[in-house]
């Protein structure tokens, strides 16, 4: 029997804030923040190379009952399906959107798997920069 990868939870505010500085992967159901841990951080937290995940559901999404339901759906999707795709020594924070409540469970797991496996997808061109005119005479002077 194949052993399941143990997925640990982020619990402290400092851990969430550290992941916030990492890569952001946007989707229609949630925003995923991803950050690879250094070996020293893993040793300090005594987590080894297990992935860690944290969930954020803001009050904007509804009352406590609705927020907890969204959180439970995301946890189950990670536990059953998407957790196997998680990279070792990586922290994930999932910031849920209201659409995660009513989305079909299959769509939720597909979206999680897609965002977990997406490695640094960036739009072409990076930041936009406007062209500055060459310095020269003002008003023809």
Curated annotation (Swiss-Prot):
It is an enzyme of class 3 (hydrolase). One of its GO terms (cellular component) is ribonuclease P complex. One of its GO terms (molecular function) is ribonuclease P activity. Keywords: Endonuclease, Hydrolase, Nuclease, RNA-binding, tRNA processing. SUPFAM superfamilies: Ribosomal protein S5 domain 2-like (SSF54211). It catalyses: Endonucleolytic cleavage of RNA, removing 5'-extranucleotides from tRNA precursor. RNaseP catalyzes the removal of the 5'-leader sequence from pre-tRNA to produce the mature 5'-terminus. It can also cleave other RNA substrates such as 4.5S RNA. The protein component plays an auxiliary but essential role in vivo by binding to the 5'-leader sequence and broadening the substrate specificity of the ribozyme. The keyword GTP-binding does not apply. Its EC number is 3.1.26.5. Residues 37-56, 114-141 are annotated as: Disordered. It comes from the Bacteria. The keyword Hydrolase applies. It comes from Brucella canis (strain ATCC 23365 / NCTC 10854 / RM-666). Consists of a catalytic RNA component (M1 or rnpB) and a protein subunit. Residues 114-124 have a biased composition (Basic and acidic residues). Belongs to the RnpA family. PROSITE patterns: RIBONUCLEASE_P. This is Ribonuclease P protein component. GO terms for biological process: tRNA 5'-leader removal.
């Amino acid at each position: 029997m194949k052993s399941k990868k143990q997925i640990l939870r982020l619990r402290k505010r400092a851990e969430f804030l550290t992941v916030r500085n990492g890569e952001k992967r946007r989707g229609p159901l949630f925003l995923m923040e991803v950050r690879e841990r250094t070996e020293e951080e893993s040793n300090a937290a005594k987590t080894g190379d297990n992935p860690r995940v944290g969930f954020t559901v803001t009050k904007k999404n509804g009352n406590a009952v609705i927020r907890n339901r969204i959180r439970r759906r995301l946890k189950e999707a990670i536990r059953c399906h998407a957790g196997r795709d998680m990279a070792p020594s990586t922290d994930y924070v999932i910031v849920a959107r209201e659409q995660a409540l009513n989305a079909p469970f299959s769509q939720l797991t597909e979206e999680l798997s897609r965002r977990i496996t997406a490695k640094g997808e960036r739009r072409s061109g990076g930041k936009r920069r406007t062209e500055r005119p060459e310095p020269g005479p003002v008003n023809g002077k």
